[in-house]
Amino acid sequence: MKEIARHCTFSPMKIKEKKGYFISFSALFLIAYMFVAAVPLGADPYFLPIWARDLASELHXERPERAVRVNADTVQTLQPFMVGEYFGYFTDZGSVVFATRVTQRLSASTHAWAVYPEHAVRTPVFNPAGEHLAEIAEPGFVHIEADRFFLFSPGGNAVSSYDARGVQRWRVLHTAPITAFHSSAAGAVIGFSDGKVMVVRADGTVRCAFYPGGSTYEIVFGVTLSADGTLAACVCGLDRQRVILVSLADVQCKIVHHQYLEGALRHQLLMNFDTEGRYVVFEHAQGVGVIDCQRLETNIIPLVGDVVGMGVQPECDVVTVLSQKEQRCRFAVFERAVHRVGDVRFDAQDVSLTQGEKKFFLSIDMLLARIDIAGIP
Protein backbone atom coordinates (compact mmCIF):
# COMPACT_ATOMS: atom_id res chain seq x y z
CA MET A 1 0.00 0.00 0.00
CA LYS A 2 0.95 3.57 -0.29
CA GLU A 3 3.22 5.01 2.32
CA ILE A 4 1.88 7.63 4.63
CA ALA A 5 4.00 10.69 5.31
CA ARG A 6 3.33 14.25 6.23
CA HIS A 7 3.52 15.74 2.72
CA CYS A 8 6.30 13.19 2.05
CA THR A 9 8.72 15.88 3.16
CA PHE A 10 12.02 15.29 4.92
CA SER A 11 14.17 17.67 6.94
CA PRO A 12 17.90 17.02 7.41
CA MET A 13 19.00 16.06 10.91
CA LYS A 14 22.30 15.61 12.66
CA ILE A 15 24.13 12.32 12.58
CA LYS A 16 23.81 10.55 15.92
CA GLU A 17 26.54 9.28 18.22
CA LYS A 18 27.61 5.67 17.78
CA LYS A 19 26.02 4.77 21.11
CA GLY A 20 22.71 5.22 19.32
CA TYR A 21 23.49 2.27 17.04
CA PHE A 22 23.55 -0.18 19.96
CA ILE A 23 20.19 1.14 21.13
CA SER A 24 18.86 0.75 17.60
CA PHE A 25 20.07 -2.85 17.31
CA SER A 26 18.39 -3.61 20.64
CA ALA A 27 15.19 -2.05 19.37
CA LEU A 28 15.28 -4.18 16.22
CA PHE A 29 15.85 -7.28 18.35
CA LEU A 30 12.82 -6.42 20.48
CA ILE A 31 10.70 -5.85 17.40
CA ALA A 32 11.85 -9.13 15.87
CA TYR A 33 10.96 -10.86 19.15
CA MET A 34 7.55 -9.21 19.09
CA PHE A 35 6.89 -10.75 15.68
CA VAL A 36 7.76 -14.19 17.00
CA ALA A 37 5.86 -13.89 20.29
CA ALA A 38 2.87 -11.88 19.07
CA VAL A 39 -0.62 -13.27 18.76
CA PRO A 40 -1.08 -14.80 15.28
CA LEU A 41 -2.96 -12.64 12.78
CA GLY A 42 -5.98 -14.80 12.16
CA ALA A 43 -5.46 -18.31 10.79
CA ASP A 44 -2.56 -17.80 8.41
CA PRO A 45 -0.76 -14.41 8.28
CA TYR A 46 2.40 -13.86 10.31
CA PHE A 47 5.32 -11.43 10.45
CA LEU A 48 8.62 -12.41 8.88
CA PRO A 49 11.79 -10.28 9.42
CA ILE A 50 13.71 -10.25 6.11
CA TRP A 51 16.81 -8.12 6.68
CA ALA A 52 18.35 -5.34 8.78
CA ARG A 53 21.03 -2.96 7.56
CA ASP A 54 23.36 -0.65 9.49
CA LEU A 55 23.78 2.32 7.15
CA ALA A 56 26.32 4.13 9.34
CA SER A 57 29.48 2.60 7.86
CA GLU A 58 28.29 2.95 4.28
CA LEU A 59 27.08 6.55 4.58
CA HIS A 60 30.03 7.70 6.68
CA UNK A 61 32.53 6.60 4.02
CA GLU A 62 34.93 9.07 2.48
CA ARG A 63 32.59 9.56 -0.48
CA PRO A 64 29.03 9.08 0.79
CA GLU A 65 27.52 10.60 -2.34
CA ARG A 66 26.87 7.70 -4.63
CA ALA A 67 24.65 6.71 -7.51
CA VAL A 68 24.31 3.32 -9.15
CA ARG A 69 22.65 3.07 -12.55
CA VAL A 70 19.48 1.04 -12.23
CA ASN A 71 17.09 -0.24 -14.88
CA ALA A 72 13.48 0.87 -15.21
CA ASP A 73 12.08 -2.21 -13.46
CA THR A 74 14.30 -1.64 -10.42
CA VAL A 75 13.36 2.04 -10.17
CA GLN A 76 9.72 1.07 -9.67
CA THR A 77 10.62 -0.89 -6.51
CA LEU A 78 12.91 1.65 -4.84
CA GLN A 79 12.02 3.18 -1.47
CA PRO A 80 13.23 6.58 -0.19
CA PHE A 81 14.98 6.95 3.16
CA MET A 82 16.22 9.80 5.34
CA VAL A 83 18.71 8.96 8.09
CA GLY A 84 20.69 11.64 9.84
CA GLU A 85 21.68 14.17 7.17
CA TYR A 86 21.58 11.60 4.36
CA PHE A 87 18.81 11.03 1.85
CA GLY A 88 18.64 8.24 -0.69
CA TYR A 89 16.91 5.18 -2.10
CA PHE A 90 17.21 1.47 -1.38
CA THR A 91 15.87 -1.68 -3.02
CA ASP A 92 13.50 -4.19 -1.46
CA UNK A 93 16.56 -6.38 -0.93
CA GLY A 94 18.27 -3.69 1.18
CA SER A 95 20.86 -2.36 -1.28
CA VAL A 96 21.40 1.41 -1.29
CA VAL A 97 21.42 2.56 -4.93
CA PHE A 98 21.61 6.30 -4.30
CA ALA A 99 22.58 8.47 -1.33
CA THR A 100 23.53 12.09 -0.84
CA ARG A 101 23.87 14.66 1.92
CA VAL A 102 21.06 17.20 2.13
CA THR A 103 20.99 20.52 3.96
CA GLN A 104 17.54 21.71 2.86
CA ARG A 105 14.01 20.39 2.93
CA LEU A 106 12.97 17.96 0.24
CA SER A 107 9.93 16.12 -1.06
CA ALA A 108 10.25 12.52 -2.20
CA SER A 109 8.30 9.51 -3.37
CA THR A 110 9.17 6.13 -4.80
CA HIS A 111 9.36 7.75 -8.27
CA ALA A 112 11.11 11.10 -7.82
CA TRP A 113 12.51 13.68 -5.41
CA ALA A 114 13.26 17.39 -5.27
CA VAL A 115 15.12 19.68 -2.88
CA TYR A 116 13.70 23.15 -2.38
CA PRO A 117 15.23 26.14 -0.56
CA GLU A 118 13.22 28.64 1.44
CA HIS A 119 12.75 30.95 -1.55
CA ALA A 120 12.69 28.56 -4.51
CA VAL A 121 12.41 30.25 -7.92
CA ARG A 122 12.72 27.06 -9.99
CA THR A 123 13.11 23.49 -8.78
CA PRO A 124 14.82 20.54 -10.53
CA VAL A 125 13.28 17.11 -10.05
CA PHE A 126 15.39 13.92 -10.02
CA ASN A 127 14.64 10.22 -10.35
CA PRO A 128 15.71 7.69 -7.66
CA ALA A 129 19.08 7.18 -9.39
CA GLY A 130 19.87 10.89 -8.96
CA GLU A 131 19.40 11.69 -12.65
CA HIS A 132 17.68 14.90 -13.77
CA LEU A 133 14.05 14.19 -14.60
CA ALA A 134 12.31 17.55 -15.01
CA GLU A 135 12.33 21.15 -13.85
CA ILE A 136 9.46 23.15 -12.38
CA ALA A 137 10.21 26.62 -13.75
CA GLU A 138 7.95 28.53 -11.35
CA PRO A 139 8.48 29.84 -7.80
CA GLY A 140 6.95 27.85 -4.98
CA PHE A 141 7.26 24.61 -3.06
CA VAL A 142 7.35 21.33 -4.98
CA HIS A 143 5.38 18.42 -3.58
CA ILE A 144 5.74 14.89 -5.00
CA GLU A 145 3.28 12.02 -4.54
CA ALA A 146 4.12 8.82 -6.45
CA ASP A 147 4.69 9.97 -10.07
CA ARG A 148 2.64 13.16 -9.63
CA PHE A 149 4.32 16.59 -9.30
CA PHE A 150 2.64 19.57 -7.65
CA LEU A 151 3.66 23.13 -6.89
CA PHE A 152 2.23 25.19 -4.03
CA SER A 153 2.39 28.91 -4.73
CA PRO A 154 4.29 31.23 -2.36
CA GLY A 155 0.97 32.80 -1.32
CA GLY A 156 -0.29 29.42 -0.13
CA ASN A 157 -3.70 29.64 -1.81
CA ALA A 158 -2.95 27.92 -5.15
CA VAL A 159 -1.66 24.53 -6.27
CA SER A 160 -0.62 23.42 -9.76
CA SER A 161 -0.14 19.97 -11.27
CA TYR A 162 2.80 19.22 -13.60
CA ASP A 163 3.56 16.34 -15.93
CA ALA A 164 6.80 14.34 -16.04
CA ARG A 165 8.42 16.98 -18.28
CA GLY A 166 7.66 19.85 -15.91
CA VAL A 167 4.80 21.27 -18.00
CA GLN A 168 1.84 22.64 -16.05
CA ARG A 169 -1.34 20.59 -16.49
CA TRP A 170 -3.81 22.48 -14.30
CA ARG A 171 -4.03 25.05 -11.49
CA VAL A 172 -6.50 25.51 -8.64
CA LEU A 173 -6.81 28.91 -6.95
CA HIS A 174 -8.89 29.96 -3.94
CA THR A 175 -9.16 33.04 -1.74
CA ALA A 176 -8.15 31.15 1.44
CA PRO A 177 -4.82 29.33 2.07
CA ILE A 178 -4.49 25.60 1.46
CA THR A 179 -4.28 23.68 4.74
CA ALA A 180 -4.53 20.06 3.53
CA PHE A 181 -3.82 18.19 0.31
CA HIS A 182 -3.72 14.65 -1.03
CA SER A 183 -3.74 13.05 -4.47
CA SER A 184 -4.22 9.68 -6.09
CA ALA A 185 -4.26 8.52 -9.70
CA ALA A 186 -7.92 9.59 -9.83
CA GLY A 187 -7.27 13.24 -8.94
CA ALA A 188 -6.75 15.34 -5.83
CA VAL A 189 -8.60 16.62 -2.79
CA ILE A 190 -7.76 20.02 -1.30
CA GLY A 191 -8.72 21.54 2.05
CA PHE A 192 -8.66 25.25 2.82
CA SER A 193 -8.47 27.39 5.95
CA ASP A 194 -12.04 28.66 5.45
CA GLY A 195 -13.38 25.09 5.68
CA LYS A 196 -13.85 24.46 1.97
CA VAL A 197 -13.10 21.02 0.53
CA MET A 198 -12.53 20.69 -3.22
CA VAL A 199 -12.18 17.46 -5.19
CA VAL A 200 -10.64 17.67 -8.67
CA ARG A 201 -10.29 14.99 -11.31
CA ALA A 202 -6.94 13.97 -12.78
CA ASP A 203 -7.43 16.47 -15.62
CA GLY A 204 -8.01 19.32 -13.15
CA THR A 205 -11.77 19.71 -13.63
CA VAL A 206 -13.67 20.21 -10.39
CA ARG A 207 -15.57 17.09 -9.29
CA CYS A 208 -17.23 18.82 -6.34
CA ALA A 209 -16.66 21.53 -3.76
CA PHE A 210 -18.41 21.90 -0.41
CA TYR A 211 -18.16 23.12 3.17
CA PRO A 212 -18.58 20.21 5.64
CA GLY A 213 -19.59 22.51 8.51
CA GLY A 214 -20.69 20.99 11.81
CA SER A 215 -18.12 22.88 13.92
CA THR A 216 -17.91 26.34 15.46
CA TYR A 217 -14.77 27.19 13.48
CA GLU A 218 -14.43 25.83 9.95
CA ILE A 219 -10.94 24.76 8.89
CA VAL A 220 -9.64 21.60 7.21
CA PHE A 221 -6.71 19.78 8.86
CA GLY A 222 -6.48 16.61 6.80
CA VAL A 223 -7.84 15.16 3.54
CA THR A 224 -7.40 11.96 1.56
CA LEU A 225 -8.71 10.49 -1.71
CA SER A 226 -9.12 6.80 -2.50
CA ALA A 227 -7.13 5.27 -5.35
CA ASP A 228 -10.21 4.91 -7.58
CA GLY A 229 -11.59 8.34 -6.70
CA THR A 230 -14.92 7.05 -5.37
CA LEU A 231 -14.33 8.10 -1.75
CA ALA A 232 -12.79 11.04 0.06
CA ALA A 233 -12.35 11.76 3.75
CA CYS A 234 -11.34 14.74 5.84
CA VAL A 235 -10.80 15.92 9.41
CA CYS A 236 -12.21 19.38 9.86
CA GLY A 237 -13.28 22.03 12.33
CA LEU A 238 -12.40 23.35 15.76
CA ASP A 239 -14.76 23.28 18.73
CA ARG A 240 -16.38 19.97 17.78
CA GLN A 241 -13.78 18.62 15.37
CA ARG A 242 -15.04 15.74 13.29
CA VAL A 243 -14.03 13.24 10.63
CA ILE A 244 -16.23 12.68 7.59
CA LEU A 245 -16.36 10.11 4.79
CA VAL A 246 -17.68 11.33 1.44
CA SER A 247 -19.00 9.20 -1.43
CA LEU A 248 -18.05 10.48 -4.89
CA ALA A 249 -19.62 7.61 -6.82
CA ASP A 250 -22.84 9.47 -7.72
CA VAL A 251 -23.41 12.76 -9.49
CA GLN A 252 -23.65 14.56 -6.15
CA CYS A 253 -21.06 14.25 -3.40
CA LYS A 254 -22.63 12.74 -0.29
CA ILE A 255 -21.41 12.48 3.31
CA VAL A 256 -22.03 8.82 4.18
CA HIS A 257 -20.38 8.73 7.62
CA HIS A 258 -19.15 11.19 10.22
CA GLN A 259 -18.04 11.16 13.82
CA TYR A 260 -17.21 13.91 16.26
CA LEU A 261 -13.77 13.50 17.85
CA GLU A 262 -12.76 13.91 21.47
CA GLY A 263 -10.02 16.51 21.66
CA ALA A 264 -8.72 18.39 18.65
CA LEU A 265 -5.46 18.63 16.76
CA ARG A 266 -4.47 21.99 15.30
CA HIS A 267 -1.86 20.96 12.75
CA GLN A 268 -1.85 19.26 9.37
CA LEU A 269 -2.77 15.62 9.94
CA LEU A 270 -1.48 12.34 8.57
CA MET A 271 -4.39 10.72 6.74
CA ASN A 272 -4.76 8.11 3.99
CA PHE A 273 -6.83 5.33 2.45
CA ASP A 274 -5.46 1.84 2.04
CA THR A 275 -4.97 0.70 -1.56
CA GLU A 276 -8.35 -1.03 -1.72
CA GLY A 277 -10.37 1.86 -0.28
CA ARG A 278 -11.60 -0.28 2.61
CA TYR A 279 -10.06 1.73 5.45
CA VAL A 280 -9.03 5.29 6.24
CA VAL A 281 -6.36 5.88 8.88
CA PHE A 282 -5.92 9.32 10.38
CA GLU A 283 -4.01 11.06 13.13
CA HIS A 284 -6.13 11.75 16.22
CA ALA A 285 -5.66 13.76 19.41
CA GLN A 286 -5.70 10.52 21.39
CA GLY A 287 -3.83 8.32 18.93
CA VAL A 288 -4.94 6.96 15.55
CA GLY A 289 -8.42 6.77 14.08
CA VAL A 290 -9.53 4.08 11.63
CA ILE A 291 -12.66 4.34 9.48
CA ASP A 292 -14.13 1.09 8.16
CA CYS A 293 -15.62 2.28 4.87
CA GLN A 294 -17.82 -0.82 4.51
CA ARG A 295 -19.25 -0.92 8.02
CA LEU A 296 -19.27 2.90 8.21
CA GLU A 297 -17.81 3.03 11.70
CA THR A 298 -14.79 4.71 13.29
CA ASN A 299 -12.51 3.18 15.92
CA ILE A 300 -9.83 5.03 17.88
CA ILE A 301 -6.51 3.37 18.78
CA PRO A 302 -5.21 5.14 21.92
CA LEU A 303 -1.55 6.17 21.77
CA VAL A 304 0.77 8.60 23.57
CA GLY A 305 3.06 10.90 21.60
CA ASP A 306 3.24 12.02 17.98
CA VAL A 307 2.27 9.63 15.19
CA VAL A 308 5.36 9.18 12.99
CA GLY A 309 3.94 6.64 10.55
CA MET A 310 0.90 4.44 10.12
CA GLY A 311 -0.84 2.29 7.56
CA VAL A 312 -3.18 -0.59 6.82
CA GLN A 313 -2.58 -3.96 5.21
CA PRO A 314 -6.11 -4.66 3.89
CA GLU A 315 -5.34 -8.29 2.99
CA CYS A 316 -5.29 -9.20 6.70
CA ASP A 317 -6.97 -6.16 8.33
CA VAL A 318 -3.74 -5.17 10.09
CA VAL A 319 -2.99 -1.61 11.22
CA THR A 320 0.64 -0.70 12.00
CA VAL A 321 1.48 2.45 13.97
CA LEU A 322 4.80 4.07 14.91
CA SER A 323 4.64 6.84 17.52
CA GLN A 324 7.25 8.89 19.37
CA LYS A 325 7.33 11.14 22.43
CA GLU A 326 10.74 12.77 22.79
CA GLN A 327 13.12 9.76 22.50
CA ARG A 328 10.59 7.15 23.60
CA CYS A 329 9.14 5.24 20.64
CA ARG A 330 6.37 2.69 20.32
CA PHE A 331 5.70 0.31 17.44
CA ALA A 332 2.31 -1.38 17.67
CA VAL A 333 0.29 -3.72 15.47
CA PHE A 334 -3.49 -4.03 15.64
CA GLU A 335 -5.90 -6.42 13.99
CA ARG A 336 -9.14 -4.87 12.68
CA ALA A 337 -8.12 -1.63 14.43
CA VAL A 338 -9.28 -3.08 17.75
CA HIS A 339 -7.20 -6.06 18.91
CA ARG A 340 -3.55 -5.41 19.71
CA VAL A 341 -1.41 -8.27 18.45
CA GLY A 342 2.06 -6.79 18.98
CA ASP A 343 3.61 -3.91 20.89
CA VAL A 344 7.20 -2.89 21.61
CA ARG A 345 8.74 0.27 23.10
CA PHE A 346 12.30 1.50 22.59
CA ASP A 347 14.44 4.65 22.62
CA ALA A 348 15.60 6.37 19.42
CA GLN A 349 16.25 9.83 18.05
CA ASP A 350 14.90 9.42 14.52
CA VAL A 351 12.41 6.78 13.40
CA SER A 352 10.21 6.27 10.35
CA LEU A 353 7.76 3.71 9.00
CA THR A 354 7.17 3.07 5.29
CA GLN A 355 4.35 0.80 4.17
CA GLY A 356 4.53 -1.49 1.16
CA GLU A 357 2.31 -4.21 -0.22
CA LYS A 358 2.43 -7.05 2.34
CA LYS A 359 5.59 -5.54 3.83
CA PHE A 360 6.90 -2.51 5.65
CA PHE A 361 10.25 -0.83 6.25
CA LEU A 362 11.30 0.50 9.64
CA SER A 363 14.22 2.86 10.22
CA ILE A 364 15.67 3.44 13.69
CA ASP A 365 18.41 6.07 13.73
CA MET A 366 21.01 4.68 11.28
CA LEU A 367 19.43 1.24 10.98
CA LEU A 368 16.98 0.04 8.35
CA ALA A 369 14.89 -3.14 8.41
CA ARG A 370 12.32 -4.89 6.25
CA ILE A 371 9.52 -7.02 7.70
CA ASP A 372 7.06 -8.95 5.54
CA ILE A 373 3.54 -10.09 6.34
CA ALA A 374 3.64 -13.68 5.16
CA GLY A 375 0.95 -16.32 4.84
CA ILE A 376 -1.34 -14.13 2.71
CA PRO A 377 -2.46 -15.61 -0.63
Swiss-Prot record:
Annotated transmembrane regions: 21-43
Keyword Membrane among UniProt keywords: yes
Location of the protein in the cell: Membrane
GO cellular component: membrane
Membrane topology category: Single-pass membrane protein
Superkingdom of source: Bacteria
Keywords, comma-separated and alphabetical: Membrane, Transmembrane, Transmembrane helix
Protein name in the entry: Uncharacterized protein TP_0783
Organism name: Treponema pallidum (strain Nichols)
